[in-house]
Amino acid sequence: MKEYLAIVTAEHAYLRAEAENENGENLSGIEDEIFSGWAVKVLEKLPGKQYLKIETHYGYSGYVKEEEIKPITEDELEKRQDKDRFFRLGISEADLLDAPKVQGLPLELLLKSCIVELLEKEVVPGWSKVRRGAGREGFIHTVNLRERKEDDGYLSEKNTEGKGYFHAMRQRLAVEEETFRERI
C-alpha cells in the first residue's frame, strides 16, 4: 500500500497504540485524541483490519478506524495551509447551526481544536459560514474561530527526510538546538 494523506471526518478519533484484535475489539491504550479536520498521513492498512496506522501533523503515530478519515490530495493539503481560510475552533464546543442565529437548528457538535474551513465571514453580524472536515456546512459565532498556529507541512510528500517531526520543525526554524528546545 502506498502512503496517502487524509483528514479526520469524525467529530474526534482516538489514536490507539495498536490495531484491533482478532475479535474486532481494540483494547489497546489511547495515545492521543485527534479532531475533525485534522490532517494525517496513512502509513499502513493491515489486511482484514478496520484500523489504519497513521501519523499526525505533529508527528505522533498510532491507529484510527478507517471510517473516521477520508483521503485528500497533496494539492488539497497545500490549500489547507491558508490561514485566512482554515481556522481552529477556540471554544470547548459549539453547535454547527443551519442558520446564522441562536435559534438555528443544531446540525452537529464541533469540538475545541477542530479545523473548519471559512466559507463566508460575517454573513450576518457575528456569524460565519463554515465547512467541517466531513463536508457539512453550517454557521457558528465568528468569535469562536481562532487562527491556526500550526500547519500540516510535516505531512507533505516534499518532507522526505524521514527524521521525525521535531527534526523537521527545527530545520524549518533554522535555529540551534538549545533555542529550539526553549521555543517548544
Residue ranges of each PLM-predicted region?
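Boundary regions of SH3-family modules and the immediately adjacent low-complexity/disordered segments
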Residues: M1-Y14, A19-G48, E55-R88, A99-L109, ...
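A eukaryote-biased sequence property
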Residues: I91-A94
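Internal, well-ordered alpha/beta segment that forms a basic, Gly-enriched binding/recognition surface
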Residues: S113
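Catalytic cores of peptidoglycan-degrading enzymes
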Residues: M169-I184
